[in-house]
Amino acid sequence: VLALAPRRGPRSTKFSSGQVAIAGGSRGLTGAVRMASLAAIRAGAGYATVAVPADLETVFEIAQPEVMSVGCPGGDGCLVPASEKAVLRTFERAAAGIFGPGLGKDPGSFELARSVVAKIEAPLVIDADGLNAFAGRLGELASRSAPTILTPHAGELGRLLEKDPDEIGAHRLASAREAAREAGAVVVLKGDDTIVTDGTRVAVNAISAPALATAGTGDVLSGMTAALLARGLEPFAAACAAVIAHARAGREAATRVGAPESVIAGDVIDSIPPAIRPDGPVE
């Protein structure tokens, strides 16, 4: 499935290679947006822009010269309804986007999420607290005009479906399918046997990567997924390709640093280039 992604050619530009927009970040959680945006670029997006709280924008300007930033007004270290216009402008030219990394649980951030996600016209990956904003309100996502990919772990999916995480764990495929159908989305239920489903088609990851059991790797997966969407893959294929490449990158990172337990999310990002190639390591 990685071979389906368009490759860069002599006439490619940073814009034709796929623009990704990302909204999120809050005080104490700026790293999530940084990792998602760097992963998107490493996975082939030609241009990435982050919409972040204005009072935290300096963090991104200093730490991430490869990524454009838009400071969104309104909140005290978080995105809130007053940030909506700036967020929507950031997504206007995006070929794909991500909403939620590092968003935080401020009620205003959740209110923004429920308003702005419906208005974003680009294919969208929703992750982390972007998902939690729709706890018990999953059906609201079905009104989106563009494709949606949800990337929950069992706890987040439990909140979306208002079910105990243990029940999700006992019925992973059925739960993922239920969520996909209710939201009209592709669901990536994360785990060692990550499941990808659009409610009808199903794919299950068979590449074990214990190194991915560390903070930030979910943000890396979101970035990779958005990049493959921006490069032109349809949502189910983009999700499958990202899951495969993410697992490969986790294994590559463990080999490079010497032990799965020593891998950090940045190591996984650095391992994306060989993992994303169609002729990359085969498990």
Indicate where each model-derived feature is located.
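Small-residue (G/A/S/T)-rich helix-start motifs and N-terminal tracts that mark the onset
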Residues: 1-124, 128, 132-149, 154-283
